Amino acid sequence: MTTGYDVVVVGARVAGASTALLLARAGARVALVDRAPYGTDTLSTHALMRAGVLQLRRWGLLDEVIASGASPIRRTTFHYADSKSLEVAIRADGGVDALYAPRRQVLDRIIVDAAVAAGVEVRHEALVTALLRDNTGRVAGVRVTDRAGRAVDLRATVTVGADGIRSAVADNAGSTVTRQGRSASAILYRYYAELPATGYEWAYGHSAAAGFIPTNEGCTGVFVGTTPARMRALRRDGTEHAFQTLLAATAPRLAERVAVAAPASRLHGWAGVAGFLRRPYGPGWALVGDAG
């Protein structure tokens, strides 16, 4: 089966769904595909800064984020080793008087639903297996396998890869890395219930960081991060050991509060990848978000 579009976007998370939404609102015929089921979580931090909240307001989606129960953030506290904490109030500006950190299964769903309302054809549980090309070699869409196992060709004038750091679109289009970083951070995080937080809280220690991110359903995300080598060494004694050791060493004041809170999820981990920039466009294709 073959269907034609102006644009097909691969990846229906924040970057891809937003791209599809804006293109559809501008009048383009857009298909949006993602291999994951609709409304699922993904490995991610999700603390939005003012620019992100402003965009949601401009797109008419901020009220839905607020209605989802995401905690309003009106203060950020910075904790430093051997120093007093620094509190910064979030000033009202541009129609935004608070920041928000909605869970990804909440935020992604809100943006995807808005894209559908704008006319985007969304296909979840659709795995991209190949890029299509015309007789000149220009990228001309994607071939996907849908949830029923059927192969479907989605032909498009432009194919947008929004499929993350391991982008299949980037690899198959022949995108090359133009700049490569040398540093990386390994992260562990978990959600806690009934954990009092004044807003965003960031703590900085020796080659490590930690923090609190209030989110939906009265929960707070707690993360720790350090170099990949240090994280690997600590995890030899177990992931829980690594999490608690880093939290106590980096942010003892935060660790005291975590000790009396109730875990609301398992630990999630990210091994760390050095940052990079890829060539973000070519004949018939472009990259957005982490893909580029």
Regions inferred by a protein language model and the residue ranges of each:
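Glycine-rich FAD pyrophosphate-binding loop
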Residues: 24-44
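FAD/FMN-dependent oxidoreductases across multiple families
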Residues: 235-292
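Helix-loop-beta segment of a Rossmann-like dinucleotide-binding subdomain
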Residues: 84-102, 141, 225-229
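Conserved Rossmann-like nucleotide-cofactor binding loop
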Residues: 15, 38, 166
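Predominantly flavin-linked oxidoreductase catalytic cores and closely associated redox partners
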Residues: 114-254
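Beta1/beta-strand and adjacent pyrophosphate-binding region of the FAD-binding site
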Residues: 2-15
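N-terminal FAD cofactor-binding segment of flavoenzymes
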Residues: 43-81
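Short beta-strand to alpha-helix junction loop
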Residues: 92-113, 168, 233-238
